[in-house]
UniProtKB/Swiss-Prot annotation:
One of its GO terms (cellular component) is cytoplasm. Consists of two distinct domains, a catalytic core and a N-terminal extension that is involved in tRNA binding. GO terms for molecular function: ATP binding; serine-tRNA ligase activity. NCBIfam families: serS. It comes from Burkholderia lata (strain ATCC 17760 / DSM 23089 / LMG 22485 / NCIMB 9086 / R18194 / 383). This is Serine--tRNA ligase. PANTHER family: SERINE--TRNA LIGASE, SERYL-TRNA SYNTHETASE. InterPro entries: aa-tRNA-synt_IIb (IPR002314), aa-tRNA-synth_II (IPR006195), aa-tRNA-synth_II/BPL/LPL (IPR045864), Ser-tRNA-ligase_type_1 (IPR002317), Ser-tRNA-synth_1_N (IPR015866), SerRS_1_N_sf (IPR042103), SerRS_core (IPR033729), tRNA-bd_arm (IPR010978). Belongs to the class-II aminoacyl-tRNA synthetase family. Type-1 seryl-tRNA synthetase subfamily. Its main location: cytoplasm. Homodimer. The tRNA molecule binds across the dimer. Pathway: Aminoacyl-tRNA biosynthesis; selenocysteinyl-tRNA(Sec) biosynthesis; L-seryl-tRNA(Sec) from L-serine and tRNA(Sec): step 1/1.
Length: 433
């Protein structure tokens, strides 16, 4: 959530910055609500002053034995008006809160202004795409003989679900273990196991609700009278970031660096018809997430560090990639600045997103009321960052395509062999005669 003081000081400036993100701020609605709020607060202050004056007058009159009934009646009327004003103020503040909850974060000044992904800016590349001396297959054709089972996944749960078997399932698990070990043993993160089902207020904290309810899988339990609504997480960023919800941490505890391997559940409501083949876009997929909670002055250094941690995974796996700075129109709702990592997929002859690393500054912290005690001993909002380190399924796709061989086998990257029992190559299971 944005700082409402920012809007009060420079409403037109904030409106322009939000317009750069493709969001139209209802300036008239905000201004009208603010005018009502100020009018009620001014009237309340006047009534409070009048009531205090009358209270003193009543005391003096009683001391003289004078009749105070008329003055007391006026005091009662003031109380009724103040109570009505308080109720009206609560209504206005609720409407302001709803308006604020729908506003995305404002972009950092270093973010390129643009409309969509066509305006993103490439920052750098690593690695050289492999030159194949045979016809390259995509991950579906490579993986199906080795244990990718789309047919059974669809039979069990419908479209965009996949079953993994045998060595492919083991390779998928090896990738997640390798990522977690790298982040915990080399990058300083604490491994965390989190709930996969969370309460609605948790999603308000990280910005998925109220705007993106249709992208979430909802879980309901209980009857009509005691129904409880919860949600499956779309990323473990949600549960990791909310660990500091409604708390004040000591400055000495920062930075907090957490990582988790979890399934992620997304309805992909706005992705009908996109990436329908294979594992690129799934309703259920695994991801290793990185989250950092830091002091405000450290957040952009932390963002660069987090991008480097995601890059390290790709480099250790020998997968070519590029780093993209997202423009204002392509960033996620909560982000102030985002870098995407895109891995090379030879069958598509292009780079595809495999990680997204974002600094949300105080946007999520304000929604969560997550604070730290600064050097002056005063509570101050933390900054929160999140990044994929990496999406496990898409990394599996990249390994299958980049490490495929002409005979249909797949070479296991050296970094994964300790997690695969020393296996250097995955071959299709022998067919029974």
């Amino acid at each position: 959530m944005l700082d409402i003081q920012l809007l009060r000081k420079d409403l037109d400036g904030v409106a322009q910055r939000l317009a750069d993100r493709g969001y139209t701020l209802d300036v008239a609605a905000f201004s009208a609500l603010e005018a009502e709020r100020r009018a009620i607060q001014t009237r309340t202050e006047e009534l409070q002053a009048r009531r205090n004056s009358l209270s003193k007058q009543i005391g003096a009159m009683k001391g003289k034995g004078e009749d105070t009934s008329a003055v007391m009646a006026e005091v009662g009327g003031i109380g009724d008006e103040m109570k009505a004003g308080e109720a009206k103020l609560g209504e206005i503040q609720a409407r302001l809160s709803d308006l604020m909850l729908g506003m995305p974060n404002v972009a950092h000044e270093s973010v390129p202004v643009g409309k969509d992904e066509a305006d993103n800016v490439e920052a750098r590349r690593w690695g050289t795409p492999r030159q194949f001396d045979f016809e390259v297959k995509d991950h579906v054709d490579v993986g199906t003989p080795l244990g990718l089972d789309f047919e059974t996944g669809a039979k069990l749960a419908g479209a965009r679900f996949t079953m993994l078997r045998g060595s492919i399932a083991r390779l998928h698990r090896a990738l997640a273990q390798f990522m977690i070990d790298t982040h915990t043993l080399q990058h300083g993160y604490t491994e965390t196991y989190t709930p996969y089902i969370v309460n609605p207020e948790i999603l308000y904290g990280t910005g998925q609700l109220p705007k993106f309810a249709d992208d979430m899988f909802r879980v309901e339990k209980g009857g009509e009278e005691n129904k409880v609504t919860q949600y499956l997480i779309s990323t473990s960023e949600i549960s990791l970031t909310n660990t500091v919800r409604e708390s004040i941490v000591d400055a000495s505890a920062l930075p907090i660096k957490l990582t988790a391997h979890s399934p992620c559940f997304r309805s992909e409501a706005g992705s009908y018809g996109r990436d329908t083949r294979g594992m690129i876009r799934q309703h259920q997929f695994d991801k290793v997430e990185m989250v950092q909670v830091v002091a405000p002055e450290a957040s952009y250094a932390a963002l660069d560090e987090m991008v480097g941690h995601a890059e390290a995974i790709l480099q250790k796996l020998g997968l070519p990639y590029r780093v993209i700075t997202l423009c204002t129109g392509d960033m996620g709702f909560s982000a102030a600045k985002t870098f995407d990592l895109e891995v090379w997929l030879p069958a598509q002859n292009t780079y595809r997103e495999i990680s997204s690393c974002s600094n949300t500054e105080a946007f999520q912290a304000r929604r969560m009321q997550a604070r730290f005690r600064n050097a002056q001993g005063k509570p101050e909002l933390v900054h929160t960052l999140n990044g994929s380190g990496l999406a496990v399924g898409r990394t599996l796709v990249a390994v299958l395509e980049n490490y495929q061989n002409a005979d249909g086998s797949v070479t296991v990257p050296e970094a994964l062999r300790p997690y695969m029992g020393g296996i250097e190559r995955i071959d299709a299971p022998a067919q029974a005669s």
